[in-house]
Design a protein with these regions (language model features):
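Zn2+-dependent peptidoglycan hydrolase active-site motif and core
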Residues: 69-71, 85, 90-135, 157-165
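A generic structural motif
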Residues: 26, 61, 80, 100, ...
Length: 182
């Protein structure tokens, strides 16, 4: 349908903007590390905290049942189906590198936060109703980032949570579940 074509074009445009922004962030981090600035974060292989109070996965990593490409993360439905407001927590210690409101940048992701945990590891928290953090903030595992919502391209209150690895040369989304089960 025309709506699906328009959505796919918007998603592709958002992905290109995001790729450019992440490349810029990664280059800045690598330059700081190369200049001798001690990174404030070094992911040490520890176990992640589950990012919200609900454990109801509504779309798993890699799912293709209702999309044209594999799902890059997991969707976690609200405790009360369709009702925004569940707290969203940092899965691990890190630095907030993106804290966007829907109107500012990516319409498909809605309000979202991205955290750099060190060693090329990032987590993203999409479709938030509101944000409690801003770019540059150091966050700790379990710290509240905002609340679950229904912003962007979303069909009900949920959290899209994903894990991305970026070594400055290649970027890939990976299954987040093993980070919780170490």
């Amino acid at each position: 349908t025309a709506d699906q074509v328009a959505y796919k074009k918007q998603l592709e445009a958002d992905e290109k903007k995001l790729d450019a922004e992440i490349a810029s962030i990664t280059a800045k981090i690598k330059a700081e590390e190369a200049s001798g600035v001690t990174p404030s974060n070094r992911y040490d292989g520890g176990t992640f905290k589950w990012p919200t109070t609900s454990t109801r996965i509504t779309s798993p990593y890699g799912d293709t049942s209702d999309r044209t490409s594999p799902h890059k993360g997991v969707d976690i439905g609200a405790v009360r189906a369709g009702v925004s407001g569940d707290p969203v927590y940092a899965a691990y210690d890190g630095k907030v590198v993106i804290a966007h409101r829907q109107s500012e940048y990516y319409s498909t992701a809605g309000n979202y936060v991205m955290i750099y945990h060190g060693n090329g590891l990032y987590t993203r928290y999409l479709h938030l109703d509101s944000l409690n953090v801003s770019v540059g903030a150091q966050v700790t595992k379990g710290q509240k980032l905002g609340v679950m919502g229904n912003t962007g391209n979303s069909f009900g209150a949920h959290l899209h949570f994903d894990v991305m690895l970026d070594d400055g040369k290649t970027r890939q989304y990976v299954n987040p579940m093993p980070y919780f089960n170490k």
